[in-house]
């Protein structure tokens, strides 16, 4: 081929290098940086019977404390000779020996679970029945017979020798399907209410409305059978879980 004089000649162009390919014809991707990224980590909350404490997420919310599920001995089921008098137990953190010191460092509390479990310690030949229930208003009179007792909240009754399978409830949150005698406070009614924390025993002259500000309920237990000789046919156990709120000096709750 002839080339014209004076015409610029172009050097042959070299082919551009192709990107290195992996098997399959795909282009190798650029790797990501493996440098650690600083991110806030939220620790997992404890569950079960572990005691839990924390601070509210919203500014201005007081510190709180969750006791988790706790089993406590409430007392013996006593029957007085010749009478059918009732035993009355105040629903209060004062009944919880394991958290008494901690509870005194808070101003308010709320029951999340409050269940009484009766365990018999008498023979099946023992006469009489046990009656259990709660009074939600401190102005309510303590029942003196089965008719008035039956109108109490979460009323339950059984032979005094019944309820042997309730012992399984003291070690698990699973409801026993066997022979258990229990009475549980309807704590859902207090889901939006806090009670003042106090170790004081309500006085007879105290206004009932004032008492209701720190005592959500009373647990009542009685026998329908007047025994000749005083006895103790069984024991009362408490399964509870409470919330505490508002840090204060422990000396405030004496």
UniProtKB/Swiss-Prot annotation:
Q: Which UniProt keywords apply?
A: Capsid protein, RNA-binding, T=3 icosahedral capsid protein, Virion
List the residue ranges of the region (S domain, virion shell).
Answer: 62-245
Q: Where is this region: R domain, interaction with RNA?
A: 1-61
Which InterPro entries does its entry note? Capsid_prot_S-dom_vir, Viral_coat
Residue ranges, compositional bias (Low complexity): 1-24
Q: Name one GO molecular function term.
A: structural molecule activity
Keyword RNA-binding in annotation? yes
* Region Disordered: start-end pairs: 1-53
Name a GO CC annotation attached to this entry: T=3 icosahedral viral capsid
Pfam families the UniProt entry points to: Viral_coat
What residue spans carry the region label P domain, projecting?
Answer: 246-254
Localization: Virion
State what this protein does: Capsid protein self-assembles to form an icosahedral capsid with a T=3 symmetry, about 30 nm in diameter, and consisting of 180 capsid proteins. Each icosahedral unit contains three protein subunits (Potential).
In the record, the note on similarity to other proteins reads:
Belongs to the icosahedral plant coat protein family.
What name does UniProt use for this protein?
Capsid protein
What is the organism field in this record? Cocksfoot mottle virus (isolate Dactylis glomerata/Norway/CfMV-NO/1995)
